[in-house]
From Swiss-Prot:
The keyword Hydrolase applies. GO terms for cellular component: extracellular region; extracellular space. It comes from Homo sapiens (Human). DUMP binds at residues 35, 40, 68, 71-72, 145. Its EC number is 3.1.27.-. Disulfide bonds join 53-109, 67-120, 85-135, 92-99. This is Ribonuclease 4. Cleaves preferentially after uridine bases. Has antimicrobial activity against uropathogenic E.coli (UPEC). Probably contributes to urinary tract sterility. Pfam families: RnaseA.
């Protein structure tokens, strides 16, 4: 009897929190957010060297079967990146209106075209520049690097 009452109270609490927006169910954004983090976020480093790109592209599993042609690593705290999601919406390349722009430190890694997976070779360019990211969810989180 007490166990059934406990379950009922927990269910009521969960439904209340969902209604208040304090707990949000995941509708696939979590996996996309984790992929965004893996492919694009590296706050500890400033990057900038070819060696950095070669190592990070391999570590982040973007060279397993083919050499990813281009990738950008953002060298900012994840909270700074997430704050971009609160800027004005702009149109993404795919036409959706869930993109946002901000200025961050980055390393752009471009495939040299002279190597084969998994031993891909990259050229690095470090800069501080405008980026566009797509955000989804509640609260909004980055799920796609759009440029």
């Amino acid at each position: 009897m007490a166990l059934q009452r406990t379950h009922s109270l927990l269910l009521l609490l969960l439904l209340t929190l969902l209604g208040l927006g304090l707990v949000q169910p995941s509708y696939g954004q979590d996996g996309m957010y984790q992929r965004f983090l893996r492919q694009h976020v590296h706050p500890e480093e400033t990057g900038g060297s070819d060696r950095y790109c070669n190592l990070m592209m391999q570590r982040r599993k973007m060279t397993l079967y083919h050499c990813k042609r281009f990738n950008t690593f953002i060298h900012e705290d994840i909270w700074n990146i997430r704050s971009i999601c609160s800027t004005t919406n702009i149109q993404c390349k795919n036409g959706k209106m869930n993109c946002h722009e901000g200025v961050v430190k980055v390393t752009d890694c471009r495939d040299t075209g002279s190597s084969r997976a998994p031993n891909c070779r990259y050229r690095a360019i470090a800069s501080t520049r405008r980026v566009v990211i797509a955000c989804e969810g509640n609260p909004q989180v980055p799920v796609h690097f759009d440029g």
